[in-house]
Amino acid sequence: MILEHVLVLSAYLFSIGIYGLITSRNMVRALMCLELLLNSVNLNFVTFSDFFDSRQLKGDIFSIFIIAIAAAEATIGLAIVSSIYRNRKSIRINQSNLLNK
């Protein structure tokens, strides 16, 4: 695949993730957009690693590390969201003012 096509796809995914983070009012949707951002960065790492030096696996290993961190982040984030929902009965970002109570 051509490098420019993959970079355009990654930029498109990144911009969708940024747009989703800015406009999202739901915490679960915001977590999904954050995962989309991380996956677009992983796509860039793997693409540049393969394009510049396909014998070294630095980009691939770094992508696997980011995937592991993202999985832990998603697990902790969903646990926090479920706890907030249990206490507040809402997962909307603008309704959960956690510093007041």
UniProtKB/Swiss-Prot annotation:
GO molecular function: oxidoreductase activity, acting on NAD(P)H, quinone or similar compound as acceptor; quinone binding
Gene Ontology CC terms, in alphabetical order: chloroplast thylakoid membrane; NADH dehydrogenase complex
Gene Ontology biological process terms from the UniProt entry: ATP synthesis coupled electron transport; photosynthesis, light reaction
A matching Pfam family: Oxidored_q2
Enzymatic class: translocase
Localization per Swiss-Prot or TrEMBL: Plastid, Chloroplast thylakoid membrane
Family matches, as Gene3D superfamilies: 1.10.287.3510
Record-linked NCBIfam families: PRK05715.1-2, PRK05715.1-4, PRK05715.1-5
PANTHER family per record: NADH-UBIQUINONE OXIDOREDUCTASE CHAIN 4L, NADH-UBIQUINONE OXIDOREDUCTASE SUBUNIT ND4L
Full protein name: NAD(P)H-quinone oxidoreductase subunit 4L, chloroplastic
Encoding gene (name): ndhE
